[in-house]
Amino acid sequence: MLPSKILLIGRNYADHVQEVFNQSASTLPPTLFMKPPTSIIGPGAAIKIPDFAQKVEFEGEIALVISKPCKNVKKENWRDVVLGLTIVNDVSDRNLQFAEGQWTRGKGIDLSLIHI
């Protein structure tokens, strides 16, 4: 079963912000972006880099898995909706990612979010 959407937070790690953006994390706040369900592949599956990709990079991430549709969950009720944590490998084409104001094209390549 694939999720209906995948929400991610970017620029949330100070050293990585400095490395990728050459700016301090205090001057460049975190941002929210999405990956489509078609970006998911399973453990051990081959990453298929598209021919048009020019600057492909990857990042290990911790993913929070939500078990059911939810909205406005009170913090004391988080266990009602959180299934667990997992590790993913977030693959991006940096040229596409930074060519526009938002990151969907560079982060949303099919088969670019690997569940480990």
Model-derived regions: residue spans:
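Conserved small/polar residues in nucleotide/adenosyl-binding loops
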Residues: 114-116
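Flexible glycine-rich active-site/ligand-binding loops centered on an Asp-His dyad
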Residues: 34-35, 77-110
